[in-house]
Amino acid sequence: DAHKNYVDTQIERASLWVDSFFVDSEYEAEDAYSQIRLRPEFYYRKEQGAKGKFRFRARVNLPNLGRKVSLVAGADDDSGFDDSVDDSADEGIVGLQFFGKQTSKWNTSFTAGVKFNDFAFFLGPRVRYKDTLGEKGSYRFTQTVRWQTNNYWQFNTRLDLNRLISDRFYFRQTFDGRWRGEKSEDEGYRTRVSSFLTHRLSDLSGFQYEFSTIFHTEPDTHVDRYVVAARYRRQTKHKWLYYEIVPQISWDEEYDYKFNPGIRLRLEFFYGRSTSREFWKGEAEDTDEFRW
């Protein structure tokens, strides 16, 4: 079976564990099972001081539709980069995601809903393609397009290059670019280039080391921020509770690239079905059969 042979490759099994355990937004966007995530967070950065944040994200599979339609609500993952490198304000949304073609390599969907910050309706497609590069390499390309009723467009383009180093170490190089019409004159094409080294300690814990550069192209091209971070994530004895400790150092253009140490503490409450899918689509990180 072509699906099983692809998913059973060592690099794909490692990618599934990394994406599911560390809750990669692109991985989560492809899951049609019902789930709720609650994330109280605390941030401290030397130049900005301390602040708290509460993130809510829900996905409800609509019954009798064969996992083809989901209601999504809460923080919009497409509004900014990951929190470890981008602390922009969350944008709340409510919408419906309609799933199209889904294979081991292809995933397509179409989402329509409303953004509350701008109070605008939006709609647009999402397409993902991934494949292996030899026995220990793979890539994933994702393109999302949105049109809003305030006549703004949004384009998100992401490329992941993955490499399995050993049974415990996994490397990913990410290029993530975002163009938003409402911010086009101030930011242009905002881009994050990140290197991630994941160290799998056990089935329940892991480190993710990161170096990221964020830059934009308007009104001129320059770097907004450099970030070095070490993210420790662990599942507790309760399968529905995770915690994270993320010390980091950044050099921000806003503060003249001064040395800016900080830390992020997060609890995550997870309710609902696991982010796993059938074997040909993926396996859960907490199944007995899942191994790199």
Give residue ranges: language-model regions:
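Flexible, glycine-rich linker and terminal segments associated
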Residues: 1-20, 264-292
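Outer-membrane pore/translocation modules
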Residues: 64-194, 199-213, 217-226, 235-241, ...
